[in-house]
Swiss-Prot record:
Keyword NADP (UniProt): no
Keywords annotated in UniProt: Disulfide bond, Knottin, Neurotoxin, Secreted, Signal, Toxin
Disulfide bonds: C24-C37, C30-C41, C36-C46
Protein's name according to its UniProt entry: Conotoxin Cal6.19
Function: Probable neurotoxin.
Tissues where the protein occurs: Expressed by the venom duct.
Amino acid sequence: MKVTCVLVLTLMALTVCQVATAYCINVGMCIYDGYCCSNRCWGGMCSPWR
């Protein structure tokens, strides 16, 4: 997981990075426990593998 939430927050202008659950956004990135990762999305959750 990479701490790129600041970048996402700037682009999305939302507080989605503060959500405790994992959600997929249109950019193809995942948000999990406040952290954004470039892993693939599976069922709206962040996949542990790329």
